[in-house]
């Protein structure tokens, strides 16, 4: 590394590690992954591994190689930059059921947001995901009531001024977008990277105390998919590949570079910041960034 680049990297690291000021009020504890769609196909490497075409259609973000045969090894083998996420060392795979208007898949061309937040009260205790952790969030077989009352539910489907729709609204103002946000469980059992139902190794924090249960003691980042679809007007023919709006769910297969993910979790979640994909909080610029201008750890 050239001396000038080395000094710049060192300066970024020093700024990144600066402690919070005493009056630094904490309002958020998060960072985000900004990723565009890679492709859509009827594969699900978690639920139907090595069975191409066995699933309903999914829309994929992140790692460009994801298919039915995907493993941790294949995600990592894709190599740095084989992702549509801004951080080139995030080789994770993210996917959800494809949205259709009639028989036409609705695929956005803009960046979608996956938030990494604290789901527990003591945000300083959140730990990075172990590499290879994978899970399914939500339930495609849920009833409308179950979807509405699920621990991951926030505001249902939204478009324009219409919120808290637990199925697709019948009409969205022309030019608006259909949006959905849904939160993942953020307590890990500390042992299993997957489970038979792809859910039991994860749990939601207690709703009152916001602490992890004893059988899932490890607090990890709470994912929150915030997905926007370019569809509006008459919504009567809008559906998910999995069914009605309340069948919404998504999958995550972690393949972050461990050091990069740890830097973002430590700086942004544990540090009580509202960070972008670079680990920079524009409201507290004195705290620096977790990653360099290229969205990588300095020196990588």
Language model feature labels by segment:
Residues 1-7:
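Bacterial N-terminal signal peptides that target proteins for export
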Residues 8-16:
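Bacterial N-terminal signal peptides
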Residues 18-22:
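Sec/Tat signal peptide C-region and signal peptidase I cleavage site
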Residues 23-55, 59-182, 189-300:
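Primary mode marks residue(s) on the alpha4-beta5-alpha5 output face of response regulator receiver
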